[in-house]
Structures are given as C-alpha cells and as structure tokens.
Curated annotation (Swiss-Prot):
Top-level class of the enzyme under EC nomenclature: transferase
GO cellular component, one term: cytoplasm
Protein name listed in UniProt: ATP phosphoribosyltransferase
GO MF term set: ATP binding; ATP phosphoribosyltransferase activity
Pathway annotation: Amino-acid biosynthesis; L-histidine biosynthesis; L-histidine from 5-phospho-alpha-D-ribose 1-diphosphate: step 1/9
Reported function: Catalyzes the condensation of ATP and 5-phosphoribose 1-diphosphate to form N'-(5'-phosphoribosyl)-ATP (PR-ATP). Has a crucial role in the pathway because the rate of histidine biosynthesis seems to be controlled primarily by regulation of HisG enzymatic activity.
HAMAP family: HisG_Short
Keywords noted in UniProt: Amino-acid biosynthesis, ATP-binding, Cytoplasm, Glycosyltransferase, Histidine biosynthesis, Nucleotide-binding, Transferase
Protein's cellular compartments: Cytoplasm
Superkingdom of source: Bacteria
Cysteine pairings via disulfide bonds: none
PANTHER family assigned to the protein according to its UniProt record, in alphabetical order: ATP PHOSPHORIBOSYLTRANSFERASE (PTHR21403:SF8), ATP PHOSPHORIBOSYLTRANSFERASE ATP-PRTASE (PTHR21403)
C-alpha cells in the first residue's frame, strides 16, 4: 500500500488561506487545527494528509522528506536558505512585507548617515544581516522570537526587523516603518526526491494549486 502524500502547514493565516487552494484540488481537511489537538489531520482524499508544524519548521520537514510538500512564507524560506527544496509556485497568499521599524522619535536616516552602530531586534537574523551589510549599515543583531515591538520601547534595540501587514501594531506601539526590505507572500515548496518519486500523485495537486493561485483562490 502506497503511503499518503503529506502536506506541511502552519496554523493561522497560512492554513486558512491554503484551504481554498486545497478545495480547488478537490480536497477538504476534515478537522480544524484550532480546535483539534491532533497534529496529523486527515482529508477527504485518503491519499493526502496534513501535518501541523511551526511556520519556521515547514521547510525543514519538507527538506528531510517528513513532508512531501508544504506552504511557507518567503520570510521563512529566505531565512532557511531553501536547500533541498523545489519552489515551483508563488501562491500569492498571506501577503505582507518585511520592514525596518523604529520608535517614532528616532531619526533613523540621520543615524545611518552618521555611521552609528545600531542594535536591531529580529527573528530574521540572516535576512537582516544581509540587508544591512548591503547598505553598509553597522548593526548588532539581537535574536528575539516574538513581541518585537517591545524592544525599542524598553531600550533593548534601536530598531526592529519584522513582518508588517496593516501597520496597526506598529502604530499602536508608537513605532514607524522606515524601510521595506522585501515583499512577502507564501510559496509552495516540494521535496526534490518526492517530486521525482511521487510525481504522478503530486502533479494534479500542484497543478490545481497553481491554477487557483493565478485565479485568486
């Protein structure tokens, strides 16, 4: 008996916005990860199951073949490096941007011009390092895992690098966006070995995802 295909998803926005793409492939997830304690969820297709993992772990599960394919944000993929992954489709879901933000009273442009060494808090350390190095800005990077907006407010950092959607959270914490690093959307990633060995099973799903993403879901 052939093992089912495994799709790695994270809870929240990516999961919710992937559901219409699965529906386009004729598949529905039969349990809600927000209410179920299960981490392996069945679908209406007996040959496809969904596993729920942390967003930052999706590329790792796919890279090592624990999942055949997954959906991950560009932010996560850039930080991961993308090794061992085939990235065929930008799904155009979970769109936002990665930006530099500072306290409203901090003159970021002046600090950069004067060559000041800035402390920057972020969970995207590699991406931030590359960005500031390319601009010739001297930074000390502080790795955080959440509540980035707090760092400038309590003097931990001069700036943060984080994802911004509406900007409402920044505004609520008296922070301003000063620089956009990149536009973010979620991509389909496929294990390279699975693409070869399970191509017949994978291709109809990948094709349906691509059509749905081009048509806006």
């Amino acid at each position: 008996m052939t093992a089912p295909l495994t799709l790695a998803l994270s809870k929240g926005r990516i999961f919710e916005e992937t559901l219409p793409l699965l529906a386009a492939a004729g598949v529905q997830v039969t349990e809600d990860p927000e209410t179920s304690r299960k981490l392996i969820l069945p679908t209406t297709n007996p040959d496809l199951r969904v596993i729920i993992v942390r967003a930052s772990d999706v590329p790792t599960y796919v890279e090592y073949g624990a999942a055949d394919f997954g959906v991950a944000g560009k932010d996560v993929l850039v930080e991961h490096g993308g090794s061992g992954l085939y990235q065929p489709i930008d799904l155009n879901i979970a769109r936002c941007r990665m930006s530099v933000a500072v306290s409203a009273g901090f003159d970021y442009a002046s600090a950069v011009r004067q060559g000041a060494r800035l402390r920057v808090a972020t969970k995207y350390v590699e991406t931030a390092r590359e960005h500031f190095a390319a601009k010739g800005v001297h930074v000390d990077l502080i790795k955080l895992y959440g509540s980035m907006e707090l760092a400038p407010l309590v003097g931990l950092a001069d700036a943060i690098v984080d994802l911004v959607s509406s900007g409402g959270t920044l505004k609520a914490n008296n922070l301003v966006e000063v620089e956009e690093i990149m536009a973010i959307s979620s991509r389909l990633v496929v294990n390279q070995a699975a693409l070869k060995l399970k191509r017949t099973a994978l291709k109809p799903i990948l094709d349906a995802f691509e059509r749905a993403s081009q048509n806006g879901g």
